[in-house]
Regions:
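Conserved amphipathic alpha-helical "coupling/scaffold" segments
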Residues: 1-154, 262, 266-276
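Signal for well-folded cores of large energy- and translation-related assemblies
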Residues: 19, 76, 138, 166, ...
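Coiled-coil heptad-register positions
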Residues: 58-61, 107, 169, 173-176, ...
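Extended, Lys/Arg-enriched charged tracts that mediate electrostatic binding to polyanionic substrates
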Residues: 153-202
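Intracellular alpha-helical coupling/juxtamembrane segments of multi-pass membrane proteins
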Residues: 154, 158-161, 241, 245-248, ...
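SMC-family hinge/dimerization module
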Residues: 186, 190-221, 231, 276
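Internal alpha/beta scaffold segment
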Residues: 225-251
Length: 280
């Protein structure tokens, strides 16, 4: 096939420009590998797709393509039994939101059957799952109290117990009989336990468990006996909290695995290609 004309047309620069706006690696690679078609029918069909997208761009404005790169791999891992993290589930929710945006964009104006119909109809938004994930997970390292009734109840117990401990210890550090043994009148945390800083020479005057010693050895951090049981309850609640978070992640991961084929987003790749061509 004669290709010298491609250099004259600077096709490589045109394709590179079109690829700049691709939202995922696969669609970018597919577009960069694009070669001129010899089959007139394929050329005609590709032009019809580009014309259809261009017409919709004029009517509806630009669609919002969000990042979806890597989501198919996450879904595949979910199918194999891997548990997705909070950050990974937020990526999944973002992809689902992207699918919904594209479907809404495509249907925002009336039109007859188009050669791009199959591409957009192949997208299957899951607004329920997307909203559940977005409501339950606030950030890659933060799950909302309202993610489940059990989680909400555990966190209320943790906060109530922590407040009770702080009140007791703050009362202790303000007490004249006790404060004279302290390096300073503060309450801190060591190894997940609330402690007070006791002067080393008075370590025997404050009954409790030593959890840490300052670098100089002048201060020992003591968990007073009065709050040992409450501190233990907090650790128990924290362990139950971690178990509940894991249970929620497993449940969401199972829902992602159930719709794994939709995350292969081959349709999104094909949508991206004629859309980027229409911008040239």
């Amino acid at each position: 096939m004669e290709t010298s004309y491609l250099k004259t047309l600077e096709l490589d620069k045109i394709i590179a420009r079109a690829a700049e706006g691709c939202v995922c690696k696969e669609s970018r690679e597919k577009l960069l590998a694009l070669e001129p078609q010899c089959d007139p029918d394929e050329v005609r069909y590709a032009l019809e797709q580009t014309d259809a997208i261009n017409s919709l761009l004029i009517k509806n404005g630009s669609p919002r393509f969000g990042g979806v790169e890597g989501v198919s791999q996450l879904a595949a891992r979910a199918v194999k039994g891997g548990v997705l993290s909070m950050g990974e589930l937020l990526m999944v929710a973002g992809a689902l939101r992207n699918f919904q945006n594209l479907v809404s964009w495509y249907g925002s104006s009336e039109h007859d059957a188009l050669p791009t119909d199959d591409l957009f109809y192949a997208l299957a938004p899951q607004p329920g799952l997307e909203q559940q994930i977005s409501s339950a997970i606030l950030a890659p390292d933060a799950m909302a109290d309202t993610a489940s009734h059990t989680l909400n109840d555990l966190r209320k117990k943790i906060r109530a117990t922590e407040n009770s401990i702080r009140d007791r210890l703050e009362s202790m550090v303000r007490n004249m009989d006790t404060s004279k043994y302290l390096q300073e009148s503060v309450v801190s945390i060591r190894n997940g336990r609330y402690v007070v800083p006791v002067k080393s020479e008075y370590r025997g005057e404050v009954s409790g468990i030593i959890h840490d010693v300052s670098s100089t050895g002048a201060t020992v951090f003591v968990e007073p006996q009065a709050v040992v049981e409450a501190n233990a309850r907090i650790l128990q609640y924290r362990a139950q909290e971690a178990q509940e978070i894991e249970r929620i992640l497993v449940a969401f991961t199972g829902q992602v695995a159930a719709i794994e084929p939709q995350f292969q987003y081959l349709s999104l790749i094909h949508i991206s290609e004629p859309t980027r061509r229409s911008y040239i």
